[in-house]
Amino acid sequence: MVVRAFVLLALFAEASAKSCTPNKADVILVFCYPKTIITKIPECPYGWEVHQLALGGLCYNGVHEGGYYQFVIPDLSPKNKSYCGTQSEYKPPIYHFYSHIVSNDSTVIVKNQPVNYSFSCTYHSTYLVNQAAFDQRVATVHVKNGSMGTFESQLSLNFYTNAKFSTKKEAPFVLETSEIGSDLFAGVEAKGLSVRFKVVLNSCWATPSADFMYPLQWQLINKGCPTDETVLVHENGKDHRATFQFNAFRFQNIPKLSKVWLHCETFICDSEKLSCPVNCDKRKRMLRDQTGGVLVVELSLRSRAFSGLCDFSDVLLHLILMLGTWAVL
């Protein structure tokens, strides 16, 4: 009789345990920093708790962070490039880092749909083994969401040689003092998207540090429009690439710092549902309502896991795009 009571008590305790409310949106946020990769997914994806999700299928190191489960790859240096199963590939001068977050429940039965979010960051780099450091330019973000299907988006922030935006200029590059004030040409380009999706620059700014939140900033583009007459936006929201130019400059009175980092917050606009081109004389309400740095992609695709066409009209793929590149001035 005592044994039965114990079993009933255990069952009651299990049933009364509070579980999280399943979040069925395929969402992943990826921050590609020079030496660190941070990935976030909304809490409770398809009912999974943070302790049931593993980075690289190995490390249960996720933490709760403001409504998200956050996973960090803290060190991309050569001595630790396989952190928690992180895979890397080096094809000079490009370095790719790959990882994934998967559900891994060791219980007898699994009641939640498995999830598998894979992602990678691509760096244009000179990988200095002796210094364990990158030539610090974050160039491209690749993300795949794998819980209901697969999708890959690639975006890159590039410099160009002139206003035709046809020839890329490799960063970092050095400007002589006499070139301060000359025109620099930059753009964000998307690959792997259908023609209906357009690239929209929400904001671009420069810092003397790789940290995009560095307190000293010089704003170039705000809500899709130039902040002053020295900045010219060529295309924004019209094509798979958004382009602009600005005058070269350097930050004053900063000891031992001669690098200027350019950061852009970008999102993808569905031209079949929204008016994407940015009109700077009469700014669209859409731009005011967007949260900066978030790429929003609505998609329909065929998944190998299903026989028919899967409609993801209610699935948003969110990517935080903090592309940074620097010039030595």
UniProtKB/Swiss-Prot annotation:
Position of the signal peptide: 1-17
Disulfide-bond pairs as recorded: C204-C264
GO MF, any single term: extracellular matrix structural constituent
Gene3D superfamilies (UniProt xref): Zona pellucida, ZP-C domain (2.60.40.4100)
A Gene Ontology biological process term: sensory perception of sound
Pfam families documented for this protein: Zona_pellucida
Lipid-bearing positions (GPI-anchor amidated alanine): A305
Proregion positions: 306-329
Chief place where the protein resides: membrane
Keyword Endoplasmic reticulum: no
Keyword Calcium: no
Domain of life of the source: Eukaryota
Post-translational modification, as annotated: The presence of a hydrophobic C-terminus preceded by a potential cleavage site strongly suggests that tectorins are synthesized as glycosylphosphatidylinositol-linked, membrane-bound precursors. Tectorins are targeted to the apical surface of the inner ear epithelia by the lipid and proteolytically released into the extracellular compartment.
InterPro entries per record: ZP-C, ZP-C_dom, ZP_chr, ZP_dom, ZP_dom_CS
Listed GO CC annotations: extracellular matrix; extracellular region; plasma membrane; side of membrane
Record-annotated ZP domain positions: 19-283
Alphabetized PROSITE patterns for the sequence: ZP_1, ZP_2
Location in or out of the cell: Cell membrane; Secreted, Extracellular space, Extracellular matrix
Oligomer status and interactors: May form homomeric filament after self-association or heteromeric filament after association with alpha-tectorin. Interacts with CEACAM16.
Name under which the protein is recorded: Beta-tectorin
